[in-house]
C-alpha cells in the first residue's frame, strides 16, 4: 500500500440511502449568484431564493459532502433535498431555528 492510496470496493456507492427526501423547485430572484453548500440547512438559505421553504425545514441538498449548487440570477431549477440526520438539532446558519427541529 502506498501512503494516501485509496482501495475502493467494486460497485456503486449510494449516498444517503434510505433517508427521507423532498424535491423543490428553486428560483434565484436576486441579481447575484447564490451558492449553497452540501450541509447547509436549506430552510435557512438566502432570501433571494424562492421555493417552498416549509417543505425544506430539516433538509439539506442531497449532494456529495464538500460540494455545492450555484443558482445564477434569474435561474430556476429543481433540486433534491435529504433529511438532516443525527439529533436533528440546528444552531447557527441564519438563526431561524436555533434548536430542535
From Swiss-Prot:
One cellular component (GO) term of this entry: urease complex
SUPFAM superfamilies: Urease, beta-subunit
Pathway: Nitrogen metabolism; urea degradation; CO(2) and NH(3) from urea (urease route): step 1/1
Predominant location category: cytoplasm
Gene Ontology biological process terms from the UniProt entry: urea catabolic process
Alphabetized Pfam families for the sequence: Urease_beta (PF00699)
Disulfide bonds: none
EC top class, as a word: hydrolase
CDD domains tied to this protein: Urease_beta
Compartment(s) where it occurs, according to its Swiss-Prot or TrEMBL record: Cytoplasm
MF annotations from Gene Ontology: urease activity
Top-rank lineage group of the source organism: Bacteria
Catalytic function, reaction form: urea + 2 H2O + H(+) = hydrogencarbonate + 2 NH4(+)
UniProt xrefs under InterPro entries: Urease_beta-like, Urease_betasu_sf, Urease_subunit
Keywords: Cytoplasm, Hydrolase
EC number: 3.5.1.5
Subunit structure, interactors included: Heterotrimer of UreA (gamma), UreB (beta) and UreC (alpha) subunits. Three heterotrimers associate to form the active enzyme.
Protein family per UniProt: Belongs to the urease beta subunit family.
Descriptive protein name: Urease subunit beta
Source taxonomy: Bacteria, Pseudomonadati, Pseudomonadota, Betaproteobacteria, Burkholderiales
Gene this protein is translated from: ureB
